Amino acid sequence: RWGLSFLANCREAAWRENTRAILALALDSLAELRRIVDVENLSYDRNQTGLLKIFRSSGSMEATLRAAKLYEELGVSVKRLTTKETIEKEPALSAISDKISGAVFYPGDESGDAFKFTQEISAAAIKRGVEFKFNCDMNELIRNGDKIEAVKTNCGLISGDAFILSLGSYSSILAKTANVMLPIYP
């Protein structure tokens, strides 16, 4: 069943629709990240100089640029860079310039130290009343109608107003305990 669904989503129209949805979510997430960073004054070696995606072959760069056209339609700034422009943007690549066919630059993207970010965001969350539970195995989602009202763990029952299920391919296993089927597979 999953395989057929996957193949159905390989069509051009489905790809465009899915890319739009994923990009909209990514842009919303980036806006929320920026808001939280500003409100909480988080310090995590934030780098707002964009993202440089480097290519060794023109074929793979062309494939990325085809997708980038859709990104541009949705408001994402994308710049195609020649090998020379790539080296100007990142001089450390000059030693391997003969192996680079160019790059795609996303000036609106940003990065930072993930460890520092998680430490900072955790501290900010604790100040707002969040309680973290570590070394607890989640065994079951307790459902009441359309709402998850608790999680059964080896540390006891954890109740809450809202839950975020973020376990990657393991999400579907835990979701199944509440009769929720997620099309996520390893």
Annotate each language-model stretch with its function.
Residues 1-84:
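Dinucleotide-binding Rossmann-like beta1-alpha1 core, especially the glycine-rich loop
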Residues 143, 149-186:
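Central helical "cap/lid" subdomain
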Residues 77, 131, 181:
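Residue-level detector of anion-binding/catalytic polar loops
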Residues 46-47, 133, 184-186:
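A short coil-to-beta-strand element that immediately follows conserved catalytic motifs
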Residues 43-44, 68, 92-97, 181-182:
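Short secondary-structure boundary/capping segments
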Residues 35, 62-74, 86, 94-162:
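Helical element adjacent to the flavin cofactor pocket in flavoenzyme catalytic cores
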Residues 30, 125, 171:
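Short amphipathic alpha-helical/adjacent loop interface patches that line ligand
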